[in-house]
Amino acid sequence: MATSEEILEQTIKSTIRDIVDFPEPGIIFKDITPLLKDPQLCKAIVQSITDQLRPLQPDALACLDSRGFWFGLSIAMELGIPMIPIRKKGKLPYETVYEEYALEYGTNTIEMHTDAVQPGCRVAIHDDILATGGTAEATSKLIKKAKGEIIAYSFLIELDFLKGKDKLAPYCTTIQSLINY
């Protein structure tokens, strides 16, 4: 008999759709938007991730722009902790600290407010998908600049073949995902 975690994993996998050649040829994009049509499934996802993070006692949850916000705010609320929005450059209204990181072609920049993380703050980092790990690694560098402590990474999906964990392990080895491909 399947466990509740296995049933949740099967339900998530059967709901996510693959979009071939998006955003560019050769890519198979994992589209999580169909999950948002099912409030009970969303609630189960939030509860499962919350259950993973609660024993670690994070002080804050840093959520990555933009799909990390979809479940991240609810997870932070369930944990009773602040959500720290990590945004693309120019999207936050207050003073920011930034980190530039490499893409396959070029670079990108993410930011957070300068007052988002206090020294010693225990931060979990959440996003929808762990692929190459570039954005999560840049977020780790932002948290470290603010003298925060990274205690966990939380993802809905991990694309194992891209080995994103390898980039994140130097910052924290607690790397959790609900489903793996």
UniProtKB/Swiss-Prot annotation:
Protein name, UniProt field: Adenine phosphoribosyltransferase
Gene Ontology MF annotations: adenine binding; adenine phosphoribosyltransferase activity; AMP binding
Subcellular location: Cytoplasm
Pathway the protein acts in: Purine metabolism; AMP biosynthesis via salvage pathway; AMP from adenine: step 1/1
EC number: 2.4.2.7
GO BP terms, alphabetized: adenine salvage; AMP salvage; purine ribonucleoside salvage
Role summary: Catalyzes a salvage reaction resulting in the formation of AMP, that is energically less costly than de novo synthesis.
Pfam families: Pribosyltran
Chief location of this protein within or outside the cell: cytoplasm
GO cellular component: cytoplasm
Subunit structure: Homodimer.
PANTHER family recorded: ADENINE PHOSPHORIBOSYLTRANSFERASE
UniProt keyword Lipid metabolism, yes or no: no
Catalytic activity: AMP + diphosphate = 5-phospho-alpha-D-ribose 1-diphosphate + adenine
Record keywords, A-Z: Cytoplasm, Glycosyltransferase, Purine salvage, Transferase
Domain of life: Bacteria
Annotated family: Belongs to the purine/pyrimidine phosphoribosyltransferase family.
InterPro entries, A to Z: Ade_phspho_trans, PRibTrfase_dom, PRTase-like, UPRTase/APRTase
